[in-house]
A protein has these predicted regions:
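Short acidic low-complexity segments
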Residues: 1, 27-37
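N-terminal beta1-alpha1 ligand-phosphate binding loop
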Residues: 2-24, 180-182
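Short, flexible loop segments at the rims of nucleotide/cofactor-binding pockets, characterized by
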Residues: 18-25, 49-54, 118-120
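Structural alpha-helical scaffold elements that stabilize or flank donor/cofactor-binding regions
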Residues: 34-35, 64, 167
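Short, well-ordered alpha-helix to beta-strand connector turns
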Residues: 38-39, 69, 98, 138
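Structural motif
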Residues: 42-44
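Cysteine-nucleophile active-site neighborhood
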Residues: 47-116
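Amide-donor transfer/coupling interface in amidating biosynthetic enzymes
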Residues: 67, 101-207
Length: 207
C-alpha cells in the first residue's frame, strides 16, 4: 500500500487519480499507523511552507518522515519541505536534503514559474530508477515560486532564468519539483517507476 500524506497542503485528488490509473493500492492519511503499514510514501503539496510545516509538526509527521527508511517521493511543495529551510516565511523545514529554497526574481521573469519545462539529467544520474523509460529532455509541468539549489543530491535540473533542482534524491528520499500527476504520459511513467522501486518491480497489478 502507498500512503499519500494528507497535511492540508496536498494536491490529493490529482495524485490519487494517478494512482487509480496505475491500479495502485493507496490510502490518503495523516495517521502514523497507516504510514507504518505502508510500503512507500507519496508526499504531495501545494501552498505555503509555513502552515504546511505547522501541520506536519502538529501531527508528529515531521519526526516520522525524518526517520523513515521507506521509499518516499515528495512532489512540488513536498519536495521543497525535504530541504533544510526556505526563504518563504522564512522557516526551517525537514532537513533531509541540504540547501535552502529561494524565490525566483520577479524582476527577471514571471513568478510563479508555470507551465511545461524541459528536465535535463545530471551527468552520472542517467540510470536513476525514477528515470527509467523517460527520454532525455522530457517536458514536465511546473507551478512554483520557490526553487531548490543544484547540489550533489540533484538528479536532474530545469532552467528558468537559471538552473534549479528538478529531481533530487538521497538514500530512500526522492523529490520532484514538477507535478508528475499533471505531466501526461511522462509523469505517469515517473510515478510507475516509483511504484516499481517500492515493490522491486514485483507489483501484483499490471499497468
Amino acid at each position: 500500500m502507498i500512503a499519500i500524506i494528507d497535511y492540508k497542503a496536498g494536491n490529493l485528488a490529482s495524485v490519487s487519480n494517478s494512482m487509480d490509473r496505475l491500479m495502485a493500492s493507496y490510502r490518503i492519511t495523516n495517521r502514523m499507523s497507516d504510514l507504518d503499514e505502508a510500503d512507500g510514501i507519496i508526499f504531495p503539496g501545494v501552498g505555503h511552507a509555513v502552515p504546511a510545516m505547522r501541520e506536519l509538526k502538529h501531527d508528529g509527521l515531521d519526526t516520522w518522515m525524518q526517520s523513515t527508511r521507506k521509499p518516499l517521493l515528495g512532489i512540488c511543495l513536498g519536495m521543497q519541505l525535504l530541504y533544510e529551510s526556505t526563504t518563504e516565511g522564512p522557516t526551517e523545514t525537514l532537513g533531509i536534503l541540504p540547501g535552502r529554497l529561494e524565490k525566483f526574481d520577479a524582476s527577471q521573469q514571471k513568478v510563479p514559474h508555470m507551465g511545461w519545462n524541459t528536465v535535463e539529467v545530471q551527468l552520472g544520474m542517467e540510470t536513476h530508477p525514477l528515470l527509467r523509460n523517460i527520454p532525455p529532455g522530457t517536458h514536465f509541468y511546473h507551478v512554483h515560486s520557490y526553487f531548490a539549489p543544484v547540489t550533489g543530491h540533484t538528479v536532474a535540473t530545469a532552467t528558468y532564468s537559471h538552473p534549479f533542482c528538478a529531481i533530487a534524491a538521497r538514500d530512500n528520499f526522492m523529490g520532484v519539483q514538477f507535478h508528475p500527476e499533471k505531466s501526461g504520459k511522462a509523469g505517469e511513467q515517473l510515478l510507475r517507476n516509483f511504484l516499481d522501486l517500492v515493490y522491486g518491480g514485483m507489483r501484483t497489478t499490471t499497468v
